């Protein structure tokens, strides 16, 4: 009913105020223009024709001029697509995109804004407001052959980005079954473990005792890094130790516990213990006294000074510690009195949904071109070159001013520009941002580690050591594979991640939740109120402003239900039960 009212109002406003712009939720005519090349990947636009896409792209100030990036040159000079680029940095992304949709002043395509375009926003801007294009009419073997084949083989990938009415308003990153279990690795500093004579903790109690021992080395230590509003704090580790399968460190997203859908922050079974653990850490100085306000720079400074022994998911220690490859390693899941099974959720980012979107501003005859561009990323080689540039042999005719990459005789990944200018870039990521990338990080495409050794340009899974059952994984910290396609940082992060692989479970709540428009609006309102309430009350419990007693916890759970948790859980349970298994 709400959607019908919205559509009626939109029609009335368009008739009365045509100068205000906005296309509304109109039927888009599917046009496959003659100038679009459907016979091969390149060029996208046939020679002799000029076509321009207006595109907003997330780029950070640390990136070089976009006109100098290899991908920009490849798209414009090889693919024959003119790009009118607007750069949007992450720190203003939310505001800029919100204003663009509110004013209906949109580009044709938006790339790299997956942290903005969650399932709820895709439904709102697409199904409700009519400001995004449903790409399903173009999802054919002729127009989008690469993604079509992926969805044919893995229909669950398509389901993960499809809304309740069968539309797809945004595409994202797909990690294959060979890789999509990659979790948010928890990191522990083994150098500090060795200083206090401890091995890797196996239980939540052992973990806290280990952090206490490290704190005793130096009272200025903050053994547990991160904060409440960052994804590298202790929250996810504790919640999973208590039995909640979740990647949300604050317990505000639906999770699975003992086979049932729960909202951890409203769950009487174990959320009280989560609060007690955080309060213990706060009272004993195991976490920062600024836990609820600390930012990334402050967290990094503590790591760089050697005063932190643990970083949660989403953190990469080498960002802060130049000796990370020697000092840090993955931490396996913990158990507790509330949960006797080591378990860890697969990454919710295995299939994302908002890295590449086409807006209603895109002309009808240009939508197919935008879809063809998006489709390129779902073929392995194209995905590879979009993210690391040209191979010196496979793209020898399209180097476009960069040196390219190759594998040396030991199959070690090498970039020619970095070899020739060893001090010009601090690390590989800086080089890629400066010379290769057009958009910020990998945001759409098919990321498939298939284990092949005969495909140049792809990682080889069998070079990783098998650490299943190894009592002390630190023995692998200095391990150098005899051959392999990983540089040191890649090897370090992937091998450390394997510490958690034996405990991965796929029995998790879906990462993308597409509800009908009415429920999407209701959930957005409920989550806003609930998130504010929970954050405030958790802060009070942890810092001692609210007594952490059984009586106060009873009041809290009553209040949290009144704030909307009960209704929210009902919606999440119904959605989960109605999913196609």
Each model region followed by its residue ranges:
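Positively charged n-region of N-terminal signal peptides that target proteins for export
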Residues: 1-9
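Conserved small-residue motifs centered on glycine
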Residues: 39, 58, 384-536
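Polar, glycine-rich mid-to-C-terminal structural blocks
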Residues: 279, 326-335, 344-361, 365-437
């Amino acid at each position: 009913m709400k959607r019908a009212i919205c559509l009626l109002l939109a029609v009335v406003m368009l008739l009365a105020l045509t100068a205000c712009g906005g296309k509304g939720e109109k039927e888009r005519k599917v046009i496959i223009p003659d100038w679009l090349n459907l016979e091969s990947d390149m060029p996208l636009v046939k020679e002799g024709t000029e076509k321009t896409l207006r595109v907003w792209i997330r780029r950070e100030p640390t990136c070089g001029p976009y006109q100098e990036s290899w991908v920009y040159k490849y798209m414009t000079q090889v693919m024959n697509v003119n790009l009118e680029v607007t750069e949007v940095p992450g720190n203003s992304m939310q505001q800029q995109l919100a204003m663009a949709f509110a004013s209906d002043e949109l580009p044709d395509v938006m790339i790299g804004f997956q942290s903005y375009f969650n399932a709820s926003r895709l439904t709102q801007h697409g199904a409700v407001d009519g400001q995004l294009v449903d790409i399903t009419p173009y999802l054919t073997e002729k127009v989008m052959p690469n993604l079509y084949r992926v969805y044919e083989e893995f229909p669950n990938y398509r389901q993960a980005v499809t809304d309740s009415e069968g539309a797809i308003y945004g595409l994202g990153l797909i990690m294959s079954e060979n890789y999509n279990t990659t979790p948010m690795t928890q990191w522990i500093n083994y150098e500090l473990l060795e200083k206090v004579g401890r091995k890797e903790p196996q239980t939540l109690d052992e973990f806290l005792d280990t952090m206490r021992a490290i704190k005793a080395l130096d009272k200025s230590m903050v053994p547990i890094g991160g904060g409440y509003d960052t994804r590298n704090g202790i929250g996810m580790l504790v919640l999973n130790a208590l039995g909640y399968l979740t990647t949300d460190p604050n317990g505000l997203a639906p999770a699975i516990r003992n086979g049932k859908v729960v909202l951890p922050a409203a769950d009487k079974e174990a959320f009280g213990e989560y609060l007690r653990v955080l309060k213990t850490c706060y009272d004993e100085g195991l976490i920062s006294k600024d836990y609820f306000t600390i930012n990334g720079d402050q967290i990094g400074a503590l790591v760089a000074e050697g005063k932190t022994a643990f970083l949660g998911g989403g953190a990469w220690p080498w960002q802060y510690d130049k000796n990370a490859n020697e000092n840090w390693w993955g931490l396996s899941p913990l158990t507790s009195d509330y949960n006797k099974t080591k378990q860890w959720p697969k990454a919710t980012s295995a299939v994302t949904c908002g890295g590449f979107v086409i807006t209603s501003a895109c002309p009808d005859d240009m939508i197919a071109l935008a879809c063809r561009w998006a489709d390129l990323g779902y073929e392995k080689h194209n995905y590879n070159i979009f993210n690391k540039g040209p191979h010196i042999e496979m793209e020898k005719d399209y180097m476009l001013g960069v040196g390219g990459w190759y594998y040396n005789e030991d199959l070690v990944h090498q970039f020619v520009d970095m070899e020739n200018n060893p001090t010009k870039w601090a690390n590989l990521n800086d080089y890629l941002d400066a010379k290769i990338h057009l958009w910020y990080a990998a945001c759409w495409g098919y990321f498939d580690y298939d284990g092949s050794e005969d495909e140049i340009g792809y990682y080889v899974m069998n070079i990783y050591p098998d650490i299943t059952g190894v009592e002390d994984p630190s023995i692998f910290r200095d391990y150098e594979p005899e051959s392999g396609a990983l540089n040191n940082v890649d090897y370090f992060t992937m091998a450390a991640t394997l510490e958690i692989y034996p405990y991965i479970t796929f029995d998790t709540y879906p990462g993308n939740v597409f509800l009908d428009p009415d429920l999407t609006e209701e959930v957005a309102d409920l989550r806003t109120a609930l998130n504010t309430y929970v954050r405030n009350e958790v802060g009070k419990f942890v810092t001692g402003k609210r007594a952490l007693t059984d009586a106060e916890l009873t009041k809290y759970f009553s209040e949290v239900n009144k704030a909307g948790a009960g209704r929210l859980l009902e919606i999440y349970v119904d959605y989960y039960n109605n999913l196609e298994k």
